Every structure is written in C-alpha cells, then in structure tokens.
A protein has these predicted regions:
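N-terminal binding-site loop/beta-alpha segment at the start of enzyme catalytic domains
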Residues: 1-88, 108, 124, 169, ...
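Active-site mouth loops of central-metabolism enzymes
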Residues: 20-30, 96-111, 147-155
C-alpha cells in the first residue's frame, strides 16, 4: 500500500488508518487483537487511539483502548516497530469528570496524560500525539457556530505547545497534531511554533464525509497553505453512509440491534441524529447503488480520492 507524508513531519502513513475507539466497549480484547492482526497483515501501518477511549466514554472504560493495544504489542514482538502510533490527550470535560476532574488542559496535564498513555500502550514513544479537542470554546461536536459568550479561562496555546515540545525533546513524542480544530486554532499553533522555534503540528483530525463538509469551510485552505494533513474521521457518517439505516431509521423498531447511533444517545443528539443527515445519506446511498457501488464504497472513495485528505480513519 502506498504511503503519504503527514505535513512536514517525517511520518509516512498509509491512506487508511485503523480507528480503535470501540475497543474495550463494543469490541472485546480478543476481537480487538484479531482486528489489529488483520489490519497489519493487509498493509495498514497507522493506528489512532486516545486516552479517553473506549467510546461512549465511561469512567470504567477510561484508557481501556490503549490498554488493549498495549497488550497486543506485548503479544506481537516487532509489531510496534512496523506501525505509526497516534494517541490523543483529552481536552476539558465534556461530561467526563473522571478525566482531570473535568478541568482544563495545562502543560502539566498534557505531560501527565502522555505518561499515562505510554504506560497503557506499553511503548516508550508515541509517534503522533494530538490534542483531542481545544480547551477554548469552538464549533465542534455538533455545535455549528462560535459563541464568544461561552469562552472560559484557558491555558495559552503557547504554554500547551511548550509542553508538547518538552515531550518531543524528551523522546516521548515524535510529532504533534490537533483534533476538532478550527482555522484559527491551526493557524495559531503553526504561527507560534514558527515564532518560538517549537514543534510544528503535522495533522488535524476532524470529521469529514459526504454528509459532513465542515472542513471545506476555510479549514481546507488553511491546512493546504500551512501544509497540515487532514486525518478524516467518521468517513461513514457514524454508519449512516453504509445504508443500514435507510429503511429503519436510527430509532425505529427495525433499527439494527446494538447499532452505535441508536445506543450512543449523546452522539445521536449532538451530531448524526438530525433528520437532514439521514435524508442526505439516503440520497447518497441510492446514488451509489444506481452506479453499481455499495454505499460504503462510495463514501470511502469520497475520502480516498480527495485532495484534502491525508489519511482516513476507519
């Protein structure tokens, strides 16, 4: 499988990245290890995880996904060296008081979270360490517009960048990235890095699919001009673009049992549960069938053949 370079970093990854947020919740450890084995066998060299996983986030499963991956590394000698490993430090609480008591994201918080991830992952370095979401108020997770009235006290970006730089200098992190960011955030991280000689962000991990084009609204130009690669998550629109909800809807009696969008109430209410999302997905899914494709093939092709996308998390 071909590889692409992430931003200006030395990381070269496959255009497919294995997402792991269900490991430890919907997917048990044995099945998770089987998925990791299969992914590596098929040539995927990129894994993404986060300290807050598994999803939906619960106190008992905090760190479960990283622990499962770490156990797999321990059972598969040499596997770690074949992979680009990405993880994320959680931002301030989104209903998760068990993470730093729901407080902000200081330099000390970033360092402590990284140390925890390294222990759970049973590795001495994380190739790409990302801020999962900003400490400041941003239009993300279903929020469409910025509202300055919702701003609260926050750690300066420069201070967060210095903490990440310390982790890079210590050899615990190779490169850094962002997630659920805005054009302002990406530009500010790059500007401060260049101004102060600090590590430059290589990536931004944001939602991107046929029914979520928020990235196209100026963030694509920002990342293109600053050479920051997009890691596209939710390329299947939380399952809406697979076609499995076309007939049943997402909350009806015919909804597939155990389906995430039906089970994860917060995600359904915040993002994918809007009627217009399913309506748009149904139209794309029908278009795929009319052209001899499965809905999933069309949805993934949209990302795989899009100049905006570096790697697609699936």
């Amino acid at each position: 499988m071909k590889t692409i370079q992430l931003g200006q970093s030395g990381l070269h990854v496959t255009p497919i990245c294995l997402g792991t947020m269900t490991f430890g919740e919907q997917v048990g450890e044995a099945d998770s290890h089987a998925i990791l084995d299969r992914s590596l066998e098929r040539g995927v060299n990129f894994i993404d995880t986060a300290e807050m996983y598994a999803v939906p986030a619960r106190a008992p499963t905090f760190g479960a996904t990283e622990t499962i991956i770490g156990n797999w590394f321990a059972k598969r000698p040499g596997a770690r060296q074949k992979l680009v490993l990405a993880s994320k430090v959680a931002g301030p609480s989104r209903g998760m008081p068990w993470i730093r008591e729901g407080k902000g994201m200081t330099a000390a918080d970033i360092v402590a979270s990284c140390e925890g991830s390294l222990r759970r992952l049973q590795t001495d370095v994380i190739d790409l360490y990302q801020i999962h979401w900003p400490e400041r108020h941003v239009p993300a997770f279903g929020i469409q517009y910025y509202d300055p009235a919702k701003e609260t006290a926050q750690t300066p970006i420069h201070e967060q960048l210095q903490a990440l730089a310390g982790l890079v200098k210590a050899g615990k992190v190779r490169h850094i990235g962002l997630s659920n960011e805005t054009p302002y955030g990406v530009h500010e991280f790059v500007r401060l890095a260049e101004q102060h000689g600090l590590p430059r962000v290589a990536t931004v991990q944001n939602p991107y699919c046929l029914i979520n084009r928020s990235y196209d609204n100026a963030l694509d130009e920002t990342c293109h001009r600053l050479n920051v690669s997009l890691l596209a998550y939710s390329p299947l629109g939380f399952g809406l673009l697979t076609g499995k909800y076309d007939a049943s809807g997402i909350e009806g009696p015919g909804t597939p049992q155990g389906a995430r969008i039906a089970s994860y109430e917060s995600v359904r209410k915040q993002r994918w549960g809007r009627p217009e999302a399913l309506a748009a997905a149904r139209l794309y899914n029908q278009l795929a069938r009319e052209h001899g494709l499965t809905p999933t093939q069309l949805a993934l092709a949209f990302c795989y053949n899009n100049w905006r996308v570096g790697s697609t998390i699936i």
